[in-house]
């Protein structure tokens, strides 16, 4: 009743075993850094860089990497994909410390909209807002199948898909597609599911 419109982009009702496994792999990378656990802000930074590199593989996926990280030389001194992973790991280390990232991973794993609300089906069935769900064709974190399941559970909801080689990050890259999906919905116009 308080919310007239709800947009859910590349998400799920609860953490899946797959996403928990991805997060655990990142935690293991952080824990493998011998400095993690020491009482200082820069502890675990090599582990954090490795964890970020692991996470990026799932955010972008094979198609995204194969499209953007091809080597331009026959025998490069450093592969583009390698330097990209290193750069992204170092970049995250400038914004986070390992303890914060570790806590975020733990929080992700506890996500469950049905907890304390009679289960997932009951919680989603109570949504009265006009709801738009947007999935991404190559998202391996929150798959189109999971998004379609949400659509079946939320009364009267609509489902659209962004066609993108960039996996979960597709909604950050495919601005025009996302705008074309969101604009009519936000303006209150009727939309047709594209899937």
Protein language model annotation of sequence segments:
Residues 4-91:
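Alpha/beta-hydrolase-fold enzymes
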Residues 12, 137-139:
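Residue-level signal for short, function-critical loop segments
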Residues 87-88, 103-123:
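Active-site nucleophile elbow and catalytic-triad environment of alpha/beta-hydrolase enzymes
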Residues 116, 140-146:
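Conserved alpha/beta-hydrolase "acid-adjacent" motif
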Residues 124-128, 153-154:
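Short, conserved loop/helix-junction motifs that constitute active-site signature segments
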Residues 127, 133-135:
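Short beta-strand/loop motif that positions the catalytic acidic residue
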Residues 148-149, 156-195:
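Catalytic active-site module of serine/aspartate enzymes centered on a nucleophile-bearing elbow/loop
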């Amino acid at each position: 009743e308080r919310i007239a419109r709800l947009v859910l982009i590349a998400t799920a009702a609860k953490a899946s075993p797959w996403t928990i496994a991805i997060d655990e792999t990142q935690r293991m990378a952080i824990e493998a850094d011998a400095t993690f656990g020491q009482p200082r802000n820069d502890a675990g930074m090599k582990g954090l860089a490795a964890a970020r590199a692991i996470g990026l593989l799932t955010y972008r996926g094979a198609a995204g990497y194969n499209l953007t990280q091809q080597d331009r030389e026959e025998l490069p001194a450093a592969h583009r994909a390698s330097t990209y992973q290193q750069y992204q790991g170092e970049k995250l280390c400038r914004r986070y410390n390992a303890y914060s990232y570790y806590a975020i991973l733990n929080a992700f794993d506890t996500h469950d909209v049905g907890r304390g609300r009679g289960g997932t089906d009951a919680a989603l069935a109570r949504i009265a807002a006009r709801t738009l769900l947007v999935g991404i064709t190559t998202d391996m974190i929150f798959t189109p199948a999971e998004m379609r399941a949400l659509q079946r559970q939320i009364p009267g909801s609509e489902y659209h898909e962004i066609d993108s080689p960039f996996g979960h990050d597709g909604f950050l890259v495919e601005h025009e597609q996302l705008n074309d999906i969101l604009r009519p919905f936000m303006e209150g116009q009727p939309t047709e599911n594209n899937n």
